[in-house]
């Protein structure tokens, strides 16, 4: 039983080493882009042996974008950010999240329009805990 456990642990460590090597590259991510470019210009065959995270992410995002199930969520996500700030946040000064209109409060008794509760006075100035 202990021999099987030792073999399983060795296989697990081997897979972790392979995955770490695959994700961090041959030089451990310490090879700068200018230095990498110079090496690749001198030895173009090394381009296949020096995978970068950007290349891996580009391949993964290309594969995800080509699947039909991800097209609708990707389009919806981009649409939201394209119009972000134009008309989505117009009514925050009139209504809060719960749909309750703000009341007419006097000075010092302001109601937060987002949450519909009384605003608390927050002290400003230097932090007394920092000397």
UniProtKB/Swiss-Prot annotation:
Ranges where the record places region Disordered: 67-131
Gene Ontology terms describing biological process: cell differentiation
Biased composition (Basic residues): 76-97
Tissue spec. comment: Expressed in all aerial apical meristems, including the floral and inflorescence meristems in the reproductive phase and the shoot apical meristem in the vegetative phase. Also detected in the primordia of lateral organs such as the leaf and the floral organs.
Listed GO CC annotations: extracellular region
Span of the signal peptide: 1-22
Keyword Secreted: yes
Keywords, alphabetical: Developmental protein, Differentiation, Secreted, Signal
Subcellular location: Secreted
InterPro entries documented for this protein: CLE9-13 (IPR039618)
Function statement: Involved in the maintenance of the floral meristem and of the shoot apical meristem in the vegetative phase. Suppresses the fon2 mutation and acts independently of FON1. In Oryza sativa subsp. japonica, the protein has a single amino acid substitution at the putative processing site of the signal peptide and is inactive.
Similarity section: Belongs to the CLV3/ESR signal peptide family.
PANTHER family listed in its UniProt record: CLAVATA3/ESR (CLE)-RELATED PROTEIN 10, INACTIVE PROTEIN FON2 SPARE1
Protein's name in the database: Protein FON2 SPARE1
């Amino acid at each position: 039983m202990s021999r099987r456990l030792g073999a399983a642990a060795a296989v697990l460590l081997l897979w972790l080493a392979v995955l770490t090597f695959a994700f961090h590259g041959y030089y451990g991510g310490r090879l700068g882009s200018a230095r990498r470019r110079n090496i690749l210009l001198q030895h173009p065959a090394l381009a296949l042996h020096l995978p970068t995270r950007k290349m891996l992410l580009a391949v993964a995002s290309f594969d995800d974008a080509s699947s039909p199930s991800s097209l609708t969520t990707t389009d919806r996500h981009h649409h939201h950010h394209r119009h972000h700030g134009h008309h989505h946040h117009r009514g925050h000064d009139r209504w809060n999240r719960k749909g309750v209109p703000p009341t007419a409060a006097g000075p010092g008794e302001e109601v937060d329009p987002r949450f519909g509760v009384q605003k608390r006075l927050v002290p400003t100035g230097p932090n007394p805990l920092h000397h």
